[in-house]
Amino acid sequence: MKIIIAPDSFKESLSALEAAEAIERGFKSVFPGADYRKLPVADGGEGTVQSLVDATNGRIIEQVVTGPLGEPVRAFFGMMGDGRTAVIEMAAASGLHLVPVDKRNPLITTTRGTGELIGAALDAGAERLIIGIGGSATNDGGAGMIQALGGRLLDNSGSEIGPGGGALSQLASIDVSGLDSRLRNVKLEVACDVDNPLTGPKGATAVFGPQKGATADMLDVLDQNVSHFADMAEKALGSTFRDTEGAGAAGGLGWSLLTYLQADLKRGIDIVLEAVDFESIVQDADLVITGEGRIDSQTVHGKTPIGVAKAAKSYDVPVIGIAGSISRDSNAVYQHGIDALFSIVPGAVPLEDAFEHAAEYMERTARDIAASIKLAKTMFLI
């Protein structure tokens, strides 16, 4: 019996690999001779680097870069086991969690550190880049990233404009002749699960600006500035992606990656499953087990369990979902490939207890699931 174990992380308690290991222990206590394949995965958000490194026996590389407020921060990226695919979470360099609440101001926060991480990945020999762009603190349209990679964004005096979305109003010309030439030979895939355009009422600023510290007065300024950046890019490069779905992701970083780096924007879970070669592994599987911290009505919108389940169903492989908590409105997942759901929490326990004993609860739940399968095989002579 071949069993694939492909969970996402359980936030604040288990990494995807730790969750997979606990599930394996539980199943092995009932089916010790089964063929187990652990594939810790993610949906392109937090934990994607760790999951892909763990799944491919890769490594984490630390790098000091420019933080959102211009200060040095210790960030990281992953190099997958093939030695040529780098995985970057832009939040590691330019994330909202790096900015104290009282200092959040997208007029001044920058994506420069994200560009520096990309440069470091190229220095490490990357030929393919996977970039997750969730959790940003920025609304600069990716200007800082472009500057870090050698592009020049100039004001009327020929000087580089400053950091942040506020400085974009000073932009008078764009020079990409110095953009890192290695980028021309790199395949760049961006994990993007939002469909917002760059500007307008559904754009980067209007939808995501407030959570990054933008006041009502800032919103119009930022939207106008990012729109100006797009106008200038269209004049300089002859192309525009401002209305492309996902252009507004990460304060316009999605647009910049499309416009300047010719990136492909895809659903995060699709990129991750392709990176771990999930399709070839699942074809002859007997069972797939997936899961994440919470399964609810939002799980069907591009989350890991549904991505895994849909891939498995292409080959008629049954799928079991395991979660820390399961909401009352989670039934939609049954129409998207998951056959059964189980919660690991043994009754009404304090949240702290659930986090602290998550591995124990996971292993026990997995053992009980395996025992139920064995019992069914015995009773119904399957």
Swiss-Prot record:
The reaction(s) this protein catalyses: (R)-glycerate + ATP = (2R)-3-phosphoglycerate + ADP + H(+)
Pfam families: Gly_kinase (PF02595)
One biological process term in Gene Ontology: organic acid phosphorylation
GO MF term set: ATP binding; glycerate 2-kinase activity; glycerate kinase activity
EC numbers: 2.7.1.31
Keyword Transferase appears in the UniProt entry: yes
Keywords: ATP-binding, Kinase, Nucleotide-binding, Transferase
Domain of life: Bacteria
Leading EC class: transferase
Alphabetical list of InterPro entries matching this protein: Glyc_kinase_flavodox-like_fold, Glycerate_kinase, Glycerate_kinase_RE-like, Glycerate_kinase_sf
Keyword Nucleus: no
Family of this protein: Belongs to the glycerate kinase type-1 family.
Protein name in the entry: Glycerate kinase
Species of origin: Bacillus subtilis (strain 168)
